[in-house]
């Protein structure tokens, strides 16, 4: 037996036991561990209607994979409509801040090498993270773990909307104050609908994330941005000082609760099986 044969047998045995060994991915770019606790505290969740819809288009409700789970918000919601959820993230600190749930199994693993058994997943969800991945490797991994006709769902959202005066200040902060500190991949969020997506896509309903925030919550959310943290690390000062006075004036009573909206972009594809060869 050759070395290659032994390697293949070990991999097959590991996979048959339900644990496909993931190799370390040294290329992971961790932009979130520094502010993991704030990320969990200030992020709004997706509406339940999103998860109900995704469950309705999956071939069954046995297993979902929340890929790049972050603080586990989506994983916990998926657990309301799936029997079991594997929630993975390449950041150990994000996983340490994730929300526990009896039907959610958290793992530290890169998106491109999940360690999930082949052909077992009904739904893969990637919430606000697809732009960070090595897409070719991730899509190969998605095809490996999905069941026939399993579903890949990727979502993204851009800047929040409150009201025009506040939106203008947030836009200025995003582009002018911390704009130079966004990782290059962030630009892909703004072109999310143009990202390669090599699965037959289906038309999806429109969804929005909605929150009710006071001014302190908005400032906390802006401070949790990776660009804000990178600015602070580079300049040893808080970039929010550049807009704080304008934001307070536009907001009014800082305790006033305002509706905050993010329109969601949702792309859903099916793991179509190849057609059998013609006889």
Model feature map: region roles:
Residues 133-141:
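A short, conserved alpha-helix within the catalytic core of class I
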Residues 112-123:
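A short acidic, Gly/Pro-enriched loop at the edge of an enzyme's catalytic core
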Residues 126-127, 135:
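A short beta-strand submotif of the Rossmann-like class I SAM-dependent methyltransferase core
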Residues 44-62:
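Conserved alpha-helix/loop element of class I SAM-dependent methyltransferases that forms part
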Residues 143, 147-213:
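Conserved catalytic/acceptor-binding region of the Class I
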Residues 2-37:
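N-terminal, positively charged/glycine-rich alpha-helical extensions of SAM-dependent methyltransferases
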Residues 6-10, 193-279:
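Conserved Class I S-adenosyl-L-methionine
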Residues 65, 71-114:
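Class I SAM-dependent methyltransferase SAM/SAH-binding core
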